[in-house]
């Protein structure tokens, strides 16, 4: 059983929801990444989404775009990101790590080399933003050969045919983008999220994480009432961006801990569609 499946199985048994923070590899600087990853875990993160820096992050808002730019100034490459995961694995063999990024760096390395290296370094899942599921069969085959979960995005405007395709390809969890637009958007409509998740659960048998627009504990708690996982990215990146270097770890820990506490205060009722048999 994969680390992701094991994690969600334990969470379901304990009637808890996952906290999935996103950070960009190399921001604020490469040498801080592994300590920052460990700090996230100590603060209560269940899964770490690690962004691969890219020069044209079309799905990301200004905050994460700036984060990617800072990492690229340090010349952080995909190889460097994988090395960071490998170093993290030297002292953490249980926390799932999911890479999130764009197709260009992966294709430059090649599917075979990328998936083999990812497996060797301890990557558990990969989400490529600009790979539509309809064109991802070959990509998914390479991932599954290495027991790496292919993770896909769904949104409020995803057509049913695409939902069905994602349901047939995805493993680990599905990332539901709760807002139209780019990362960092505001005005989360929880009623709409609840309705959309109800519809998705009749088709998606793996856990569903919700992200975009989650900026505080109250919203994180409300989303945890509806979803299997809460994904927080832009708010954490903002904390990194505005913190003096010496205070980054402390400030991020404080923020993530507050989100953890809020999520754990949510209703313990497990999400309707996720069963241990699906994990």
From Swiss-Prot:
Record's catalysed reaction(s): (1S,2R)-1-C-(indol-3-yl)glycerol 3-phosphate + L-serine = D-glyceraldehyde 3-phosphate + L-tryptophan + H2O
Cellular compartments per GO CC: cytosol
HAMAP family (UniProt xref): Trp_synth_alpha (MF_00131)
InterPro entries listed in its UniProt record: Aldolase_TIM, RibuloseP-bd_barrel, Trp_synthase_alpha_AS, Trp_synthase_suA
SUPFAM superfamilies xrefs: Ribulose-phoshate binding barrel (SSF51366)
Xref: Pfam families: Trp_syntA
GO molecular function list: tryptophan synthase activity
Organism classification: Bacteria, Pseudomonadati, Pseudomonadota, Betaproteobacteria, Nitrosomonadales
Primary gene name: trpA
Family: Belongs to the TrpA family.
Subunit field text: Tetramer of two alpha and two beta chains.
Organism: Nitrosospira multiformis (strain ATCC 25196 / NCIMB 11849 / C 71)
CDD domains referenced in this protein's UniProt entry, alphabetically: Tryptophan_synthase_alpha (cd04724)
The protein, known as: Tryptophan synthase alpha chain
Gene3D superfamilies named in the record: Aldolase class I
EC number: 4.2.1.20
The keyword Amino-acid biosynthesis is annotated on this UniProt entry: yes
Annotated metabolic or biological route of this protein: Amino-acid biosynthesis; L-tryptophan biosynthesis; L-tryptophan from chorismate: step 5/5
UniProt entry keywords in alphabetical sequence: Amino-acid biosynthesis, Aromatic amino acid biosynthesis, Lyase, Tryptophan biosynthesis
Active site: 49 (proton acceptor), 60 (proton acceptor)
